[in-house]
């Protein structure tokens, strides 16, 4: 409309050109406005995303810190929780038949019967071959050795004593075998290969030193020259440039022999078995290649054409292949020792034949089927028939009722914040709800597993509920406690415990009415810090029961009372001493009522009777008691008892002298 108004005052040409110019300016201005709007939207999105990260960052850091602190000083054991009962491997079924008289019989039977020993299995090693590829074959193939001498030593790492600087190590030779070099891979029976057996008694603890861990040391040696040690051309050039110091370091070996070593742990320091039945291929390392001086570890980018020794080991060698079995002397059956291996992330219990890992069923699918409501028997039948699959768990983070981020699928049931292996979906959700209440977790069924919506709990009470004294202590006070300490008194709300419902995933579903569960504090107590009135130091929890303001007889008040009595002029010295003792007694015990005077007089002669006898104050004490009787505070019976006690003390004093 504006161009039409300007064009009406002149010719048509001017009005037409003005309208075109105005239309062009309008298009240009609209483009600028659109760009600014997009820029504002992007800035708003970035700012909103930054707020989302900040909202989830603080609780995550708090829970990571709590995880580390609970690992150092745990407050409770997760296996003792009701929803974590599957983590407790111990059962109380044997307690009913337990008898204290049977302990000696069981110990004697375990010593006599060798078959009842925990480690009654022998370690059998069947060597398949020693593989070491060379870049060029030797010219004199007639003299070439087709076998390698392999020696196996059992290394026992013992506990360090006070006088020892390092842990004592014992090497027990178990045997030496000739292993074929670079054999052809063909289905040959294990009986055709050299076999070595480590007896079971070698794994028994030693009397002098308690063994901490057991490991196997493989030492392979081959009589060949240094120029034909199986390395490539550039490796030979590198080895030829060794310094004289390194050559002297390796002078214990012959010039025509090269030795390779490798070590594998059998039992770790926790007595857990690390080597199960199966076929192994271990990478051997030449002794001469070990560096003399220490080098700093650095990060390095691996290129496609670059030769990397650790990755080329299993393709070029040297490697030693062998089959490991745990066997008995009587029967040649593979029986694993009682020491349990390291549990896998998705297996609830370890099986005996651990080489067949495909038969192990993960417990996640069973947990889902066991926890869902009405069609429980049908789904349990399907669980036994169909093979169990891994349960994929997705975490979807919500902020302002909008999805901000979704994690990749996890095939385990570990808590993302404290890395606790819950092993079951119900246990994971229960743990997240109770242990990480700064967030709100809602379970959503997913076709491939489960989805957990995570949002910030706005109703969380984040006030400090611990000891206020810890705030003023050093930062490392929580890590330096040697034992439990007394906390401030708290009040716990008594609630009715209804009949415990069966575990069900429906309790973690999002409520239909949209109202979030209100989190409230069920334990209330003192979170204020109090101070002593005289020293201005913080009041400790063990001092809360004593009123700091109720200072009846501090040292300064006792001294001031004695000085005031000394200033009296109308009484004699004996009466002054009786007044001092009586006033200090009343200040200490806080006698304030008339009915307490009989007890006060008896306490007076019992506590200070010896002093009154030594200073000859018995008559002054009698006058004091009579004076109190005149005022109606004590009875004559109290006077008789008190004076009888003083006379007994006087006779004892005379008898001693």
Swiss-Prot record:
It is found in: Nucleus. GO terms for cellular component: ESC/E(Z) complex; nucleus; RSC-type complex. Pfam families: VEFS-Box, Zn_SUZ12. Its main location: nucleus. Keywords: Chromatin regulator, Metal-binding, Nucleus, Repressor, Transcription, Transcription regulation, Zinc, Zinc-finger. Residues 347-358 have a biased composition (Low complexity). A zinc finger (C2H2-type) spans 413-436. Residues 528-604 are annotated as: VEFS-box. Residues 335-363 are annotated as: Disordered. One of its GO terms (molecular function) is zinc ion binding. The keyword Ribonucleoprotein does not apply. The keyword Nucleotide-binding does not apply. GO terms for biological process: chromatin organization. InterPro entries: Polycomb_protein_VEFS-Box. Belongs to the VEFS (VRN2-EMF2-FIS2-SU(Z)12) family. Component of the prc2/eed-ezh2 complex. Polycomb group (PcG) protein. Component of the prc2/eed-ezh2 complex, which methylates 'Lys-9' and 'Lys-27' of histone H3, leading to transcriptional repression of the affected target gene. This is Polycomb protein suz12-A. It comes from Danio rerio.
